[in-house]
A protein has these predicted regions:
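N-terminal binding-site loop/beta-alpha segment at the start of enzyme catalytic domains
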Residues: 1-83, 149
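Terminal-tail/helix-coil boundary detector
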Residues: 1-2, 41, 205, 229-262, ...
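Conserved, mostly hydrophobic/aromatic
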Residues: 6, 18, 40, 55, ...
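Short, well-ordered coil/turn segments that N-cap beta-strands
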Residues: 11-16, 51-53, 79-83, 120-124, ...
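Active-site-proximal loop/turn and secondary-structure-junction residues that shape catalytic pockets
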Residues: 22, 89-91, 129-132, 160-162, ...
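Glycine/proline-rich, positively charged
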Residues: 26-27, 94-194, 198
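Generic structural signal for well-ordered alpha-helices
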Residues: 44, 67, 71, 111-115, ...
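Aromatic-lined glycan-binding groove of carbohydrate-active enzymes
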Residues: 194-231, 266
Length: 345
């Protein structure tokens, strides 16, 4: 396994991050495709044995059971000082006005709840899952800084939002001498490259580690367009995002298939190699519900694309509507939070 620094920090992470969104009790909406604890543990062990030391989850995944399953497995299988555990906060998952978004109260409660579920006394990377329009940026950034100073959080990161909002949050922290974000977790893959316009150049300039979610476009990049799975049939976000863009995306998938066939490798190799050809990318967040998913992703680290193949892959891309970054309206009751909003990575 290869290891790199996470952004401009001294923290070393594996070139792949295991995304634990799919690990959780299936009856806990909104992820009915999730694997229960018994099915999840072998995959976490497989990741550890392959040298993956970076694990990402969130308080919202499967009603918190993702953190419980992930935390328990890591406590029993790994040394705490050898792994990097990341979680996220923003989306409300209880019917209460202060259990979501990014107020000081919500952030403090969220980290305590996450640490309890993980069974740990700190997390390495605490990320805001989305931008909160209802809370002053200063309140959010100072609260995150205070968590670092309290020892509950080692580093902070952010996820899908407009680049200018991310820059504003960073500037607010720098101006006040508070902890700055070291990572950005955007949606980025061969079928959705809108982040190349502003967010990725900003991250490269500022030394922000980019850990993209949905690197396989919810599996679309790994199979023929007509092939479906339980996930594609139940994932509201994927249905909205990719089914509506079939005419734009199918030519890209065809090129992925062609290059994979030429090299006699799985299509996932092409998707991962393309991501890792970008200097701004630190570690794609890989979801795995089968052992072969994980072994394929790991072996992709030894595969690379030629410059001509990268050009060929990118030439078919057409602009997409921006998606995955707009949170629910701040006055939306938590119980009415759209399921599609919390099925993102």
């Amino acid at each position: 396994m290869k290891y790199v620094n996470l952004g401009r920090s001294g923290l070393k992470v594996s070139r792949l991050c295991l995304g634990c969104m799919s690990y959780g009790e299936p009856e806990q909406l909104p992820q009915p495709w999730s694997l229960d604890e018994k099915a999840s543990r072998p995959l976490i062990r497989q990741a550890l044995e392959a040298g993956i030391n970076f694990f990402d989850t969130a308080n919202i995944y499967s009603g918190g059971s993702s953190e419980e399953i992930t935390g328990k497995a890591l406590r029993e299988m790994a040394r705490r000082d050898e792994i990097v555990v990341a979680t996220k906060t923003f989306f409300p998952w209880r019917n209460s006005p202060n259990t979501g978004f990014l107020s000081r109260k919500a952030i403090f409660q969220s980290i305590d709840d996450s640490l309890m579920r993980l069974g740990m006394d700190y997390v390495d990377l605490f990320q805001i899952h989305r931008f909160d329009h209802s809370t002053p940026v200063e309140e959010t950034m100072e609260a995150l800084h205070d968590l670092v100073k309290a020892g509950k959080v080692r580093y902070i990161g952010a996820s899908s939002m407009e680049a200018w909002r991310f820059a504003k949050m960073q500037h607010t922290a720098e101006r006040n001498g508070w902890t700055r974000f070291i990572t950005m977790q955007p949606q980025y893959n061969l079928l959705y490259r809108e982040e190349e316009r502003e967010m990725l150049p900003l991250c490269e300039d500022q030394g922000i580690g980019v850990i993209p979610w949905s690197p396989m476009a919810r599996g679309r990049l790994t199979r023929d367009w007509s092939v479906t799975s339980r996930r594609t049939q139940n994932d509201a976000f994927a249905l909205k995002m990719y089914e509506n863009a079939a005419l734009l995306d199918k030519p890209v998938i065809d090129i992925v298939a062609s290059i994979a066939e030429k090299h006699a490798v799985p299509r996932a190799h092409v998707a991962i190699a393309w991501l890792l050809s970008k200097s701004v990318i630190t570690a794609p967040i890989i979801g795995a519900t089968k052992p072969e998913h994980l072994s394929t992703a790991i072996s992709a680290l030894d595969f690379s694309l030629s410059d001509a193949e990268i050009i060929e892959l990118e030439a078919q891309y057409l602009p997409h509507p921006v998606d995955g970054i707009i949170p629910p309206l701040p006055d939306t009751p938590p119980s009415l939070t759209p399921p599609s909003a919390i099925q993102n990575c």
